[in-house]
Regions:
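Conserved catalytic core of the tyrosine transesterase superfamily
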Residues: 1-315
Length: 315
């Protein structure tokens, strides 16, 4: 197989296997997203422009072709504006890498940088009212191991405003609950790490959880804090498991609380924590990185207008 532009594919290989992994230290999810973007771009060249993979090279990364690729994602693959923008960001990142390796390719950055991003509609901020949150927390059966586990997970998620993936990734060694200043160590998007303080109530709850679910004689720092047991084998709890039990508890909670949303999902706990702090008077300038996405949605500019809040809690 003869390639028209061998340097193009070598650059893709090094970009995906070395630059994103070693230099940028991106998470596996981000690496996967960038790889998918380039795969889709090559698919577009083949299906829409009739170019075999061997015929594609740097000279084909033009303003016209990239604009056509984004239009194809919209009309043929029905991608949302935010997804289309993510694909464009990945291609721009590749163009930047290519220009670092060979400055003569800086023109790629200029061409692709001129491609307009898609306008995205503002997302509705979904959160649970205080009453709905209380009703949700009442649903797990604390006399059962899984029920107690689910309760502890939801309480910890609300207390720390952690993302679901961040909590399922937590290992016992990431907890520090015996000292004067108890904390939890979270690894977020892009492998960004942060230390989050824990409230006294959560520390007491976690100590009970550890005694019940991780007895001291067999406890190891490398063990995942939250796990499932199937046929006697422990496995890291998945985000799908969290989504399922929260959906179940949300449906049960709606029977006793009319303010419960029709659909309850993990990220609502993160938004709920941020909204409850915001309503209690926390200035946006004090929001740390844990709430950066929420703070962007509640920018000083947007507060001048009604904020889209999806909750039935009375004003």
């Amino acid at each position: 197989m003869r390639l028209k532009d061998e340097a193009f594919y070598k650059a893709i290989r090094d970009f995906l296997n070395f630059y994103l992994v070693k230099q940028k230290n991106y998470s596996p999810n981000t690496q996967r997203s960038y790889r998918e973007a380039l795969n889709l771009l090559l698919l577009y060249f083949k299906t829409e422009l009739g170019m075999e993979y061997t015929q594609v090279g740097f000279e084909d990364l033009t303003y016209s072709n990239i604009s056509g690729f984004l239009a194809w994602l919209d009309t043929e693959r029905h991608c949302s504006p935010s997804t289309i923008n993510l694909r464009l960001m990945a291609i721009r990142s590749f163009a930047k890498y290519a220009s670092i390796v060979d400055p003569s390719r800086i023109y790629l950055q200029v061409d692709i940088g001129n491609v307009d991003v898609r306008k995205c509609q503002g997302k509705v901020v979904e959160f649970l009212s205080v009453s709905a949150l209380a009703a949700l927390m009442e649903q797990p059966d604390l006399n059962k191991k899984n029920g107690f586990r689910d309760f502890c997970f939801m309480k910890l998620m609300y207390d720390t405003a952690a993302r679901c993936q961040e909590l399922v990734d937590v290992r016992i060694g990431d907890l520090s609950i015996r000292g004067v200043h108890p904390t939890i160590y979270l690894t977020g998007k892009g492998r960004k790490m942060r230390i989050v303080p824990l409230s006294a109530d959560i520390v007491d709850l976690l100590k009970r959880y550890m005694d019940a679910m991780h007895p001291a004689p067999s406890r190891k720092d490398s063990d995942f804090l939250f796990y499932t047991t199937i046929h006697g084998v422990r496995s890291k709890m998945s985000t799908d498991t969290v989504s399922l039990f929260m959906k179940k508890y949300g449906a049960a909670g709606k029977q006793i609380c009319v303010e419960m949303p029709e659909r309850v999902h993990p990220h609502q706990l993160r938004h709920s924590r941020a909204m409850h702090l915001y309503r209690s008077g926390m200035p946006l300038t004090l929001y740390d990185n844990s709430f950066n996405q929420f703070a962007e949605q509640l920018s000083v500019k947007s507060i001048k207008k009604p904020v889209p809040l999806k909750s039935k809690e009375p004003a």
